[in-house]
Amino acid sequence: MSSLVRKIISTAKAPAAIGPYSQAVLVDRTIYISGQLGMDPASGQLVPGGVAEEAKQALTNIGEILKAAGCDFTNVVKATVLLADINDFSTVNDVYKQYFQSSFPARAAYQVAALPKGGRVEIEAIAVQGPLTTASL
């Protein structure tokens, strides 16, 4: 049995990890993107403006990691949204729809007790490299 290749995906266009983890890991054609806060890559600080701005920045960061892996948002098949306040769900959805416009990935959303750096939203994603065709079952 041949072994699968594990490759670390990293880009300076997304925030550096704030703990012992990689921005993303590619195994075979699957990319596992670590949770992204609404952090500015240059300053390492949360962007001002509340949950909508944090969600935009988190998704922008995911987009840069996807680009580093040769992908874009159409390659995302699963996302997880962590919220400091579940009442922000619809606000984050409004931002989310600007990045995922059709053939939405599977997704879960949870309220958590707290997020790193006092963030209001964190988003992680799983994507698959290569062209994807959407089919109806």
From Swiss-Prot:
GO cellular component, one term: cytosol
Modified residues (Phosphothreonine): 74
Compartmental location: Cytoplasm; Nucleus; Peroxisome; Mitochondrion
Residue positions, PTM Phosphoserine: 136
Reaction equation(s) it catalyzes: 2-iminobutanoate + H2O = 2-oxobutanoate + NH4(+); 2-iminopropanoate + H2O = pyruvate + NH4(+)
Keyword match Mitochondrion: yes
Residues annotated with N6-succinyllysine modification: 13, 67
Similarity field: Belongs to the RutC family.
Protein name in UniProt: 2-iminobutanoate/2-iminopropanoate deaminase
Gene behind the chain: RIDA
